[in-house]
Amino acid sequence: NSIGGVVSLKAAEILKENCNGLVLIDCAQRTMDDKRLKRSDVLMNLLRPLIKTLVSKRIISNTLFERAANPRVIKQILKKAYPSGKNIDEELIEILYNPTQRRNSKEAFRGFINLFDDYLATDLFDKVYAPIQLIWGERDPWESITEAQSWKDNHNNIQRLDVIKEAGHCPHDENPEETNNLICKFIQETK
């Protein structure tokens, strides 16, 4: 899911023929990556140097982390990620909150928000020979379904784009039954 999709694509590239298929759920599009400058709007291109400078400063990244590493804030973010509201509970909040209390979690966060020149899914699709399924939440607030459709239209190894109605960034949590059925169908089709 999300950035894990890009990691999975890179792993599939390395594994070559040992990868039989790939399921990407709301794969990260990494809209802030430097390689996407030409596709960004003028305002984003103007703001990008400022954003990069600010988030590279520990005082800023630590402040952002300390504000985000709060169960109330995590719950607010989850409400955006899960527009149906399904499966947002104390257990999920705790699962996401607990790692923020570990040693070096601030540095991990700082590293993550400073990834401005890394792998893009679009750079990896054509290096993966296995069939790919995209599963997308219809109401994902961060990863554009329009771009997912463009990926499918432009990359032959993307065999399916399945959209889960009313789901957001984590359709596997909001609607696990439908997500699992779609994955099983893809596995059957690609045997």
Give the residues covered by each predicted segment.
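Conserved loop-alpha-helix segment in the C-terminal half of the alpha/beta-hydrolase fold
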Residues: 127-167
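Conserved alpha/beta-hydrolase catalytic His-Asp/Glu region
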Residues: 34, 58-130
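Short aromatic-enriched loop/helix-cap "lid" or pocket-rim segments at secondary-structure transitions
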Residues: 33-39, 139, 146-148, 174-176
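Catalytic active-site module of serine/aspartate enzymes centered on a nucleophile-bearing elbow/loop
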Residues: 157-191
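Catalytic nucleophile serine of serine hydrolases
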Residues: 1-2, 26
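Gly/Ala-rich beta-loop-alpha elbow adjacent to hydrolase catalytic centers
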Residues: 4, 8
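Flexible "cap/lid" loop of the alpha/beta hydrolase fold
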Residues: 9, 13, 20-62
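Generic structural signal for small/hydrophobic residues in well-ordered secondary structure
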Residues: 26, 77, 96, 109, ...
